[in-house]
């Protein structure tokens, strides 16, 4: 009997040890769990477990390494209606097809579906994330030109729909294309392809596979589609949210690829395959121009690593199959 009890104790200790070092017993986060984030803003340790002590948030922490954020603040306390109108100054110009579509109220309403957005870190970090989100999406929807009134970076959010679109339909059994529908770029982030519409729709509770044009006709849904993309990690890519709020810790491979926390890595996430690792690039410069203007209007510094000129692009995958959303 004593021998049996001793064997049980040894087995129990072994199981606990395997859990601590990251064995195959249901890890909670990080690469061991498909890129999942810890609930409550907790840190993900190198072994894939959630917590808030230095064992989790210290060396080799994978994500959300700053620990839980302070109590959430309503986004309107960080960006007022008048500042929003100044940031997107010419979005309602008569020459912009999006005139009247991208409203402040729709932005604030959509952000409530993602309470971590603009609510992670200190006030400067929160404002910088708002500037980064609006900067990247302004590049995607810009109607500006070099000699435009108030400069090229005052013309974000001029377009809702992609110009010269195609169907963007890929045969996938999980998210089949609906008859007669096209999945071209729409909304602030210009979401495209049927599998992205399908997964986004599932996340926000709207049938975007059958009704993709809701992204171009319902302004709250439109902003939600962009925030879904922003808050969602796609392995091996972290989420833009985690990068800009410094909750992402680059791996040794990321460091070797010069992918470090900052606005430049967000550009890499969004369009690195076409824009990053090519030296000076006018598209990257345009994204930075919007970001700097918006940071100035919000009264916050730019942070480090603004470009991706020397970064190796993240590995591209066709399907967003392992998505984890920060909420």
From Swiss-Prot:
Compartment(s): Vacuole
Xref: Gene3D superfamilies: 1.10.530.10, Endochitinase, domain 2 (3.30.20.10), Endochitinase-like (3.30.60.10)
Enzyme Commission designation: 3.2.1.14
Keyword Signal applies: yes
Maturation-removed propeptide residues: 317-327
Reaction catalyzed: Random endo-hydrolysis of N-acetyl-beta-D-glucosaminide (1->4)-beta-linkages in chitin and chitodextrins
GO cellular component: vacuole
Single Gene Ontology BP annotation: polysaccharide catabolic process
Endpoints of the signal sequence: 1-26
Main location as per UniProt: other
Keyword Signal: yes
Enzyme class: hydrolase
Chitin-binding type-1 domain residues: 27-67
Residues the record marks as active site: 140
Pfam family, one: Glyco_hydro_19
S-S bridge residues: 29-44, 38-50, 43-57, 61-65, 96-158, 169-177, 276-308
Domain of life: Eukaryota
GO molecular function: chitin binding; endochitinase activity
Keyword terms: Carbohydrate metabolism, Chitin degradation, Chitin-binding, Disulfide bond, Glycosidase, Hydrolase, Plant defense, Polysaccharide degradation, Signal, Vacuole
Function as written in the Swiss-Prot or TrEMBL entry: Defense against chitin-containing fungal pathogens.
Family indicated by similarity: Belongs to the glycosyl hydrolase 19 family. Chitinase class I subfamily.
Protein's UniProt name: Endochitinase CH5B
Species per Swiss-Prot/TrEMBL record: Phaseolus vulgaris (Kidney bean)
């Amino acid at each position: 009997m004593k021998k049996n009890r001793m064997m049980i104790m040894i087995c129990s200790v072994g199981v606990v040890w395997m859990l601590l070092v990251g064995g195959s017993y249901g890890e909670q986060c990080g690469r061991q769990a498909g890129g999942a984030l810890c609930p409550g803003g907790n840190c993900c340790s190198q072994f894939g477990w959630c917590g808030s002590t230095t064992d989790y948030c210290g060396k080799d922490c994978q994500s959300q390494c700053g620990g839980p954020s302070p109590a959430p603040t309503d986004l309107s306390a960080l960006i007022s209606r008048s500042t929003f109108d100044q940031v997107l100054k010419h979005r309602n110009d008569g020459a912009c097809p999006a005139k009247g579509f991208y409203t402040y109220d729709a932005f604030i309403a959509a952000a409530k579906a993602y309470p971590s957005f603009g609510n992670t870190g200190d006030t400067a970090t929160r404002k910088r994330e708002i500037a980064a989100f609006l900067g990247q999406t302004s590049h995607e929807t810009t109607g500006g030109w070099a000699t435009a009134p108030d400069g090229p970076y005052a013309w974000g959010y001029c377009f809702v729909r992609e110009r010269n679109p195609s169907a963007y339909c890929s045969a996938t059994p999980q998210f089949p294309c609906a008859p007669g529908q096209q999945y071209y770029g729409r909304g602030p982030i210009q979401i495209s392809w049927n599998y992205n519409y399908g997964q986004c729709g599932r996340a926000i509770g709207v049938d975007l596979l059958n009704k993709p044009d809701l992204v171009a006709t319902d302004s709250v849904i439109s902003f939600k589609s962009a925030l879904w993309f922003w808050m969602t990690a796609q392995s091996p890519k972290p989420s833009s949210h985690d990068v800009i709020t410094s909750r992402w810790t680059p791996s040794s491979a990321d460091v070797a690829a010069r992918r470090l926390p900052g606005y430049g890595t967000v550009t890499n996430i969004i369009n690195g395959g076409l824009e990053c690792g090519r030296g000076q690039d006018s598209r990257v410069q345009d994204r930075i121009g919007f970001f700097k203007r918006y940071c100035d209007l919000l009264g916050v510094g730019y942070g480090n690593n603004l470009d991706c000129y020397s970064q190796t692009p993240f590995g591209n995958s066709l399907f967003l199959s392992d998505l984890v959303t920060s909420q």
